[in-house]
Each structure stands twice: as C-alpha cells, then as structure tokens.
Amino acid sequence: MLAVLSPAKKLDETLHPSARLHTLPELLPHTQNLIEQLRGYDAAQLAHLMKLSPTLAELNVQRYQAFHFPFTPANAKAALFMFQGDTYVGLQAGSMDEQALLFAQQHLRILSGLYGVLRPLDLIQPYRLEMGTALVNGRGKDLYAYWGEHLVERLNAASESHGERTLINLASIEYFKGVKRAKLAGALITPIFKEVKGGEAKVIGLMAKRARGMMARYMINQRLESPEPLKTFNQGGYVYQPKLSTAEQWVFTRSAA
C-alpha cells in the first residue's frame, strides 16, 4: 500500500548538513530542465505566471537562480522536513523515529510540480511551482503535459514490491490530476474528511489538509500494509462512515468545534 500527498507552499529551509538519512529525487533530470526554463523568467513574468505578489516573485527568482547540483545535505533538505503546510502539521514528521521514517520512505510519496514524485527522504531545494501552473514547455501547455506518464510510472514502480497494490490518495485534486488514473496499477482509495455542523457535513479545506497528514502519520505509525485498517483511523475525532462511503471514496466525519 502506498499513500500520496501534495507538497506545501510553506517551507522550512533550515539545513542539516549532518543528516544521515537522505536520497535523491528519482526524476531529477526532468527537474533540471524546468529549472533552466524558469531561470529565464524575471520577477514580473514569474508573478504573472504563478499569480504571486512582487515580493514572492522576487524570492522565487532568487531561488531558481540559486539552484545548484548535485544535491547534498549541505545545500538541500529531505522533502518530508522541508514542507511545513497544513498537511505536514498533521503529519508531524519531526517526531518520527528512524524506523518510522524508513517505513514512510517505502510507503509514502509526495507529488510536486517541480520534482514530479518525491520520496520522504529525497533531498530538495526550496521552490514554488504548483502542479496547476500553465507553464508552456517543450512537452505541452502545462505541467500536466510536462510530467505526462512519469508520475504514474513512479507510483506503480513504488507499489510493485508491496503485497497490497492500493494507492491511498491524500493529495489535492490539483496534484492528483497529474496521475493518469487509467494506467494506475491496483486499487485507488480517496479518503474524504468532513466537518459536521448543524446536521450538515462539509469539507473544510484547512481541516481536510491536516486530516490527510494525520492519516498518513497513522498509516506510518501503525505500519499499515493494507487499506482496511485505515477504517479505524480516529485521530482528531474523525470516524469512518460506511453509509456515506463507496469503494473508492472513504468518508470520515467529525463534529465541528
């Protein structure tokens, strides 16, 4: 069983040069091609392309100019610790021990507009490039065209050694759109997290993001190899609702605060 997450805009860029556990992104040559293209954009062009403020656009111009290879712990950081958004608040990677991190390395993947597919311990340098960006490139009109079948191929390769070839989709719609569903090996399950208030259940973006991280952590901590035990997930007060669920969409609800 394999789970996928989206990345985060908020980053912790503090480096740990002595970090022992690290790997390199598997699609790095494709990343290098994108970096070369993005280095040709000035702040105004980047602001227009990514809908960024002038300050953020300038920051990312500097980031792309500063990219340098090869990646080492002295100039890059493991993806699981670099990303700091709501999903990663729920994941709490900083409190995982080495065995948990090694399990995550085998059973968790992070989709990325710049890196394609990341393993948790893959070294990355800071960036901003969302999967939905309409970046015209040599392969098509956007990043979905650029990554093509690379994403699903890497996910299939990752799950090949697992006894249970089920993908748990904890990514956003924007990011998972890059995975060609028809070519995905095995079953697909997308957990849906809803808040119940006044008798009505709704998806609240912030809460759903954190819940996705909490479920990923639950899967890692429990060393889950098959999806059925995920129905016992109850972190944060969520409860699985079989009557609201389907084979491919598992609904979890909790009472809104």
Swiss-Prot record:
Q: Which Pfam families match?
A: H2O2_YaaD
Question: From which domain of life does this come?
Answer: Bacteria
Ranges in coiled-coil conformation: none
Looking at the UniProt record for this protein, which Gene Ontology cellular component terms does it annotate, in alphabetical order?
cytosol
Cited InterPro entries: YaaA (IPR005583)
The record's listing under PANTHER family reads: PEROXIDE STRESS RESISTANCE PROTEIN YAAA (PTHR30283:SF4), PEROXIDE STRESS RESPONSE PROTEIN YAAA (PTHR30283)
* Name of the protein in its database record: UPF0246 protein Mmc1_3117
Q: Which organism is it from?
A: Magnetococcus marinus (strain ATCC BAA-1437 / JCM 17883 / MC-1)
In the record, what lineage is assigned to the organism producing the protein?
Bacteria, Pseudomonadati, Pseudomonadota, Alphaproteobacteria, Magnetococcales
